[in-house]
């Protein structure tokens, strides 16, 4: 449930593509044209989502695994993730180690 402008909107988890920290809020990027702002922490929302479906790729980003279109090596051991909407995020070294074993190699071979 997302609260916006005095209304409560139900955003199905199946529509959520990624979540990004934005100060004291989280931007929920779904199939809507613009992200919804939720007053919560990214960690709190991550606890409520299926970890097999949503991956923590950076301290500021959580991404639906199926929304990742491309995985490419980047500078200093980081990895660049290109999403299906054309946006790009960095998979930091810190969070790369938390991914399921073999996931990164499997994605790179797709």
Enumerate the predicted regions with their spans.
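Conserved binding/recognition cores within well-folded domains
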Residues: 1-90, 107-110
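C-terminal output/interaction extensions
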Residues: 94-110
């Amino acid at each position: 449930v997302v609260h916006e402008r005095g209304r409560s909107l139900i955003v199905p988890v199946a529509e959520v593509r990624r979540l990004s920290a934005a100060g004291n809020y989280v931007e929920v990027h779904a199939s809507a044209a613009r992200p919804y702002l939720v007053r919560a922490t990214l960690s709190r929302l991550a606890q409520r989502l299926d970890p097999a479906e949503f991956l923590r790729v950076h301290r500021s980003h959580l991404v639906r695994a199926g929304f990742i279109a491309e995985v490419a090596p980047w500078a200093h051991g980081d990895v660049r993730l290109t999403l299906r909407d054309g946006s790009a995020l960095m998979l930091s070294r810190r969070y790369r180690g938390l991914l399921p074993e073999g996931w990164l190699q499997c994605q790179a071979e797709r």
